[in-house]
A protein has these predicted regions:
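Extended C-terminal regions of large enzymes
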Residues: 1-7, 11-390
């Protein structure tokens, strides 16, 4: 669904259904140095496959994060009022895979496009082998599952399917359902009622239009004070009180709360990094945001991009681009590319009237302690304001 970035909303407002590219008469683009390009691509593939998370992504996909983030105490639960969900195992990647092994036509590991070497996607089916959804991801499970206290993975998959069909973001709709539950519109954990509500989006009922407009709109309409959004976009499935670098990314990303902009997680390669410290979060967020903006500009998938953050794999990526374009590129190429993209995004936001006041998490993350850790988001404002200010 073209929902998370707002692309679907813009297209819908213009009654634009599709963009069709006709390559008739176009000359195929080929690498300038084919031999060096093949060599660099081979090295790049090895670097991606050597990533420690690689086997888990291939065998389980992003839902492998459910139990991991739940164990960190940062799994959004009951509209971000808790950091752990008692029903986490019932919606975990491991449980999902066991179900899929028993179901006809299910594919626990699936390439979302030809040539992918990560294969982190999947095809999730029902007991009869009918496809419910393909690309059943961690973020959907977190926002539509634990965040709404729903522990029925099939119900979550069906909600995912409906969101795909009507072209809305599962994270923002999950956030909208949770704030609606907080307002008393439906009961916590009532999966059937939640699925029925999501189906109303396509029917354009009053409730459906409200939910379809997302988390912030729904919360404001219902008078809910605890609305988990930045710049109008719902937070992802990582509570920023426990993963404070992610909170900095949520705050400062030009797009709003966006984990893909720079997901700052504990890294075995950097044991000194403390995700719960109030200081030292701006630097990691800035580094990742710059790298990911560069990789986005190159059209790289995030799952392939994350293993390329270290200097050696990153130099291999730069060699790959250099061999393709025929242009000499230095070690700062990716950082410069990312910085250029972030500057352009920031310039747009400045022109649209956004200020530093918009680079903030909702107050409740700063004031309410997150069980079970008792953490609050307490990164100093001056550290937040140092990010993406070029």
């Amino acid at each position: 669904a073209a929902g998370g970035s707002g692309c679907g909303a813009v297209m819908g407002s213009k009654n634009l259904k599709a963009v069709i590219l006709d390559d008739t008469g176009c000359t195929p683009v080929e690498a300038k140095d084919k031999a060096k390009f093949r060599e660099a691509v081979g090295a790049l593939s090895k670097a991606i496959l050597a990533d420690p998370l690689g086997p888990a992504m291939k065998n389980i996909g992003t839902p492998v994060l459910v139990m991991m983030i739940n164990s960190f105490g940062c799994f959004p639960t009951k509209n971000y009022s808790l950091g752990q969900f008692e029903g986490a195992e019932k919606i975990s990647g491991e449980y999902m895979i066991e179900l899929m092994k028993k179901r006809p036509n299910a594919q626990p590991s699936h390439r979302c496009m030809e040539g992918c070497i990560v294969s982190c996607s999947n095809v999730y089916t029902d007991e009869k082998g009918e496809v419910i959804v393909s690309g059943f991801e961690y973020e959907t499970i977190g926002l539509m599952g634990s965040n709404c206290m729903i522990d029925d993975i099939d119900i979550i998959a069906h909600m995912n399917r409906v969101c795909n069909d009507v072209g809305v973001d599962t994270m923002d709709i999950g956030g909208a359902i949770a704030v609606a539950m907080e307002a008393g519109l439906l009961a916590w954990g009532d999966g059937k009622a939640a699925l029925s509500l999501v189906r109303e989006i396509g029917k354009a009922t009053d409730r459906g239009v409200m939910i379809g407009n997302g988390c912030r709109f729904t919360g404001e309409k219902l008078g809910v004070k605890r609305i988990p959004h930045v710049k109008g976009q719902c937070l992802s499935a990582y509570d920023p009180r426990g993963l404070k670098g992610v909170g900095v990314t949520y705050s400062t990303s030009p797009m709003g709360a966006d984990h893909t902009a720079g997901l700052v997680l504990p890294n075995p390669g950097n044991p000194s990094y403390n995700p719960g410290s109030p200081t030292g979060q701006g630097g990691p967020s800035q580094f990742l945001q710059t790298c990911m903006a560069g990789m986005d500009s190159l059209g790289l998938c995030m799952m392939a991009g994350m293993p390329l953050l270290d200097p050696v794999p990153q130099s291999t990526l730069i060699s790959c681009v250099s061999a393709f374009t025929g242009e000499p590129l230095d070690e700062n190429y990716l950082a410069n590319l990312g910085t250029s993209a972030l500057k352009a995004e920031r310039k747009f936001n400045d022109a649209a009237g956004f200020t530093e006041k918009d680079d903030r998490l909702p107050r409740f993350f700063l004031e309410e302690k997150l069980p079970p850790s008792g953490n609050i988001f307490d990164v100093p404002e001056e550290e937040i304001d140092s990010v993406n200010r070029f």
